Amino acid sequence: MKQSKIFIPTEKEVPAEAQVKSHIFMLRAGFIRQVAGGIYAYLPLANRIINKIESIIREEMNRIDANEMLMPEMIPAELWKESGRFYTYGPQMYQLKDRHDREFIMAPTHEETFTKIISDEIKSYKKLPLILYQIQQKFRDELRPKNGLLRGREFIMKDAYSFSSDQKGLDDAYDLIESAYKRIFDRVGLDYREIIADSGSMGGKDSAEFQAIAATGEDIIAYSNSGKYAANIEMAEEFFEKKIPDEDKKALVLVDTPNAKTVADDADYLHVPTHKIAKCIVFEADDELVAVIIPGDYDVNEIKVKNFLDAKHLSEAEEQEVFKIFGAHFGSLGPVGLKNKDIRILVDRTIQNEANWFVGSNHDGQHYANFNLDRDLKDFETGDFLTAKEGSISPDGKGKLVFTKGIEIGHIFKLGTFYTSKMGGQIQNEKGKLSDIIMGCYGIGISRLLSAIAEQSNDPKGFIWPKAVAPFNVHLITMNTKNESQVNLTKQIDKNLQEAGFEVLVDDRKERPGVKFADSDLIGIPIRVVVGRQADQQIVEVKARGQESTNDVSTDNLIAFLKDKLNELK
């Protein structure tokens, strides 16, 4: 393809609105243009990459016998009311009405739509298992869209759904798609990790995320530096084994802590480490109050608390409300004496491993010293409620936790019967009885994947696209378009390369060589072939993007040389 005929509006200056490299270079290199906040047009080069990503996804999904479909973008609101998500999804959901005052939403996901079709059409276990998928636009009204395609209001997504008659069918489908996702992300050249994740608003229990490693990522990943463990910070755990405290229990006594408002204040006044002060955080979980007791040197993990309670809503209680019930302000709250206040008590599992804690007394200015869980508290539940710390021992006992940032590019869920039980998704099983269809759902954010690849594939000059997704294989540049020998050789090389299966972008523009080279570096095609001063000798200059060295190559050997060079590249 001739560069003079393709729309590539490159820019020299860094756009003011762009903060991360992927956004900066995609604007400068003419890959995307903003239409509105969080809404972008994919220009020809970006569209070519999107098409290649989608092709790889289709190959791997078809390999596991998944069926491609296409669902509507506009969905009747009653489907989401039927599942209950219409009332819980929040303000990210675009809503509209037609001229007959009927409610619709612009789909942020498609679980309900797929469930509706399967529920209507499949009534016997004999028609299952089944995996369906689509590549479709999605819409979310992000409060603050940012970083280009990484957080937009409209985006491209591949979403898949498995339907099974039993748990084994779900497990098998989950494993198949998990393996397919790994092949997809390997093929596009990503540095990524599969991590334990929270299901969030999708429903279900078991889930995993695929995270592209990137300093600009919004998610924090905790992983073992010498094992396979990896988890989103929301779900990350530390190594734990229950043990008997190694010190004798002392008598529970009240001690003064005047003017102490924080754990640090208490520790300074009492001359003890913050770890030995067990703090109490009070939450409103749906329709009940919950007190969570954790060591003072840790932060509470609200996702873990919410999942433990199986709560739909969780928020920290207001101090005024807490004072009415506890009789004390934040900083003086504790678990002793709460059993008569109709408050559910959760205690982090690490509290039981040590003796003689300091805890709030529910009287301002006083704490209890020598609190021992098994002696001083009844009617409590234990679990892991801590936000893991970097450097702590990995839960598998192999190495220590290291934190890094990532961009979520894929998510897989075992939904179970979360949707089918509410939306009439029943079949007659092998025993002739009705049972709910068991679902899984599996997503890849394609436009976000494009940005993640871009974040990992650049240098100060521009992009260095992995060969599997690069818009072209070869950037063929004519140094002087007024030189007949160079022009003719360029045409012959272009013809030969295309016949050999290469995708070639021919820079035939009447621009200075410096402009052409700068644009070539910015666009980031894997290999550059320059037809210049040695054209009469049938010799061209070959350079791989991201490498400093160049090679003078005879046109007789060019195809073989380029094939070898491409094989060397990522």
Curated annotation (Swiss-Prot):
Homodimer. Keywords: Aminoacyl-tRNA synthetase, ATP-binding, Cytoplasm, Ligase, Nucleotide-binding, Protein biosynthesis. The keyword Protein biosynthesis applies. Pfam families: HGTP_anticodon, tRNA-synt_2b, tRNA_edit. SUPFAM superfamilies: Class II aaRS ABD-related (SSF52954), Class II aaRS and biotin synthetases (SSF55681), YbaK/ProRS associated domain (SSF55826). Its EC number is 6.1.1.15. It is found in: Cytoplasm. It comes from the Bacteria. Catalyzes the attachment of proline to tRNA(Pro) in a two-step reaction: proline is first activated by ATP to form Pro-AMP and then transferred to the acceptor end of tRNA(Pro). As ProRS can inadvertently accommodate and process non-cognate amino acids such as alanine and cysteine, to avoid such errors it has two additional distinct editing activities against alanine. One activity is designated as 'pretransfer' editing and involves the tRNA(Pro)-independent hydrolysis of activated Ala-AMP. This is Proline--tRNA ligase.
